[in-house]
UniProtKB/Swiss-Prot annotation:
Species the sequence originates in: Neisseria meningitidis serogroup C / serotype 2a (strain ATCC 700532 / DSM 15464 / FAM18)
SUPFAM superfamilies associated with the record: FAD/NAD(P)-binding domain
Keyword presence, NAD: yes
Protein name, UniProt field: tRNA uridine 5-carboxymethylaminomethyl modification enzyme MnmG
Gene3D superfamilies linked: FAD/NAD(P)-binding domain (3.50.50.60), GidA associated domain, C-terminal subdomain (1.10.150.570), tRNA uridine 5-carboxymethylaminomethyl modification enzyme MnmG/GidA (1.10.10.1800)
Cofactor(s) in the UniProt record: FAD
């Protein structure tokens, strides 16, 4: 049957990408349908019970700046918060939280059920329908056809998923859930370029069988950090500690003894796993000289005894899993609640996507999350929001939301995917960004909220809070510039106390704050230095960073401006680069293969030289007359 209601946007999949995509589309006013094989698993944390971290936390803040759900849901479910790299430069400081997975899932479910313009339906999708080269809808397992002008696919690890434990394997999307075999087969029929990747998860441990007296405690930070600009510490549930243990030489010997039954070493697994989140057997094999690896025991929630041992993801046989866990300090009597496993799944080459995350071959079909070759909740959620928003822009025939590399980590993520593709699961790091001083956690709202508000992603309450913060920052910076001190105005002992030396000349607070040995709090102890209005910690942080890093930021802005022309310069559709005179055969081949949308994208394709970019600029001015 054909369902009687036609939707603007259909989202397939209810993980982190799918929920953000559906919420984004519905916030923008589009009639949206979220289809999931099981409503009870909406927003489920399939692997580790944590959100954020270096690079990943930056993405969460960007999601939040665009009205997304992940940061706020983390504030409502986070049971431990830490600020990573707190003593380092502002660019690499990041927030990480342990989340109660039951609370997190319940919070996302509540957001979905209370979102206007959003319908939910429980049924696996087995087919997509086309009208020529345009998407027209989807068909579920029981034959219901839902019509829509745009579809966002966020299938995660479910497409032709296969789970491995030792030499045993079976079809599945994750433990306890079926694979999307029919949908995976249908997408292959559409000749979308695809491949296989692998990820894994560790065994879960019953906390009642852990000897915590043998472990090192790792408490959260005080004061407790907050993830969302709409959140507060008052939202946080009870806070708890994580715990640290280590592998040892006995552990490593046990792991090696299982190599002959490992699906990874016996060739049972074909997909490539994540380089930066390797299995414990991969670590022992690659770093054979290391006698020990640190393992974090992370609580799964406040109402369960389950612990997640971060660092021992494995697909080794279950008897080896038991032995390796019990070989570690504090875990001698540990009971495993769930075995670790690896999962192989289909992904689709993201070089077949536009910067909007729409496929180049099927109009109105958008991909987000692990289907694009990424790994991680945060990477998936960020893509989901962008794909959901751009699906609405597509339906409305309006320009897509495109984020530049110097504007957002989400811009870096998408640009890396669509220009370079992936040969292993892609994870975000701050080192992937050329302009990371611009892309700090603390200024995500300053970079993105205005763009989000313009297209309806950001609500009025968040927009009002943003403007109040922005204006407070501007007022305080201006006040610092107009508050002057002379050597005669301050007592000599006060000058030495605050500045470490006597003032040699008149200076304002703005110039004094730029000194490397001075911070805002110390300056405010000067007589007459305190502002008349009470400033939030977030405003003070922004003021201090903007003032102290102004010279570096200005230099980066000059570099960005010098590249902006080539970054945004559009390349026409339908160019046969084989006919573009002067380009080498390698460059012609790679440009035809990747089909970049802009000169900036072309410049980042491996093998495309600066000389080739200059030649493209010349041909662009002439209109590529010979190449159409």
């Amino acid at each position: 049957m054909i369902y009687p209601k036609t939707y603007d946007v259909i989202v397939v999949g209810g993980g982190h990408a799918g929920t953000e995509a559906a919420l984004a589309a519905a916030r923008m006013g589009a009639q949206t349908l979220l289809l999931t094989h099981n409503i009870e698993t909406l927003g489920q944390m399939s692997c580790n019970p944590s959100i954020g971290g270096i690079g990943k936390g930056h993405l969460v803040r960007e999601l939040d700046a665009l009205g997304g759900a992940m940061a706020l849901a983390t504030d409502k479910s986070g049971i431990q918060f830490r600020r990573l790299n707190a003593s380092k430069g502002a660019a690499v400081r990041a927030t990480r939280a342990q989340a109660d997975r039951i609370l997190y899932k319940a919070t996302i479910r509540e957001m979905l059920e209370n979102q206007e313009n959003l319908d939910l339906f429980q049924q696996a999708v087995e087919d997509v329908t086309l009208d020529g080269e345009r998407i027209s809808g989807v068909v579920t397992a029981m034959g219901v056809e839902f019509k829509a002008r745009a579809v966002v696919l966020t299938a995660g690890t479910f497409l032709s998923g296969k789970i491995h434990i030792g030499l045993e394997n079976y079809e599945g999307g994750r433990a306890g859930d079926p694979a999307a075999k029919s949908l995976g087969g249908r997408l292959r029929e559409l000749n979308l370029p695809q491949g296989r990747l692998k990820t894994g998860t560790p065994p879960r441990i019953d906390g009642r069988t852990i000897d915590f007296s043998q472990l090192t405690e790792q408490p959260g930070d005080t004061p407790v950090p907050v993830m969302s600009v709409r959140g507060s510490a008052d939202m946080h549930p009870r806070q708890v500690s994580c715990w640290i243990t280590h592998t040892n030489t006995q552990t490593h010997d046990i792991i090696r003894s299982g190599f002959d039954r490992s699906p990874m070493f016996t060739g049972k697994i074909e997909g490539v796993g994540p380089r930066y989140c390797p299995s414990i057997e991969d670590k022992i094999n690659r770093f054979a000289d290391k006698d020990s690896h640190q393992i974090f025991l992370e609580p799964e929630g406040l109402t369960t005894h389950e612990y997640y041992p971060n660092g021992i993801s494995t697909s080794l046989p279950f008897d080896i899993q038991i032995a390796l866990v019990r070989s570690m300090k504090g875990l001698e009597n540990a009971h495993i609640l769930r075995p670790g496993y690896a999962i192989e799944y289909d992904y689709f080459d993201p070089r077949n996507l536009k910067a909007s995350l729409e496929t180049k071959t099927i109009q109105g079909l958008f991909f987000a999350g692990q289907i694009n070759g990424t790994t991680g909740y945060e990477e998936a959620a960020a893509q989901g929001l962008l794909a959901g928003a751009n699906a609405v822009q597509y339906v409305r025939e309006q320009d897509p939301l495109l984020l530049r590399r110097e504007q957002a980590y989400l811009g870096v993520l998408v640009d890396d995917l669509i220009t370079k593709g992936v040969n292993e699961p892609y994870r975000m790091f701050t080192s992937r960004a050329e302009y990371r001083l611009q892309l700090r956690e603390d200024n995500a709202d300053m970079r993105l909220t205005e763009d989000g508000y313009k297209i309806g992603l950001v609500g009025e309450a968040q927009w009002r809070m943003f403007n109040e913060k922005r204006e407070a920052i501007e007022r305080e910076i201006q006040r610092l510039k107009t508050t002057w001190y002379t050597p005669q105005k301050l007592a000599e002992d006060e000058q030495i106390r605050v500045f470490g030396q006597k003032l040699s000349r008149e200076a304002n607070l703005h110039d004094l704050l730029r000194r490397p040995n001075l911070d805002y709090a110390a300056l405010m102890t000067l007589e007459g230095a305190m502002p008349s209005e009470r400033l939030s910690a977030e405003v003070v942080e922004q003021v201090e960073i903007q003032v102290k890093y102004q010279g570096y930021i200005d230099r980066q802005n000059e570099e960005i401006d010098s590249r902006r022309d080539i970054e945004t310069l559009k390349l026409p559709d339908g160019i046969d680069y084989g006919k573009v005179k002067g380009l080498s055969a390698e460059v012609q081949q790679k440009l035809n293969q990747h089909k970049p949308e802009t000169v900036g994208q072309a410049s980042r394709i491996s093998g495309v030289t600066p000389a080739a970019v200059a030649l493209l600029m010349v041909h662009l001015k002439r209109g590529f007359k010979d190449a159409k």
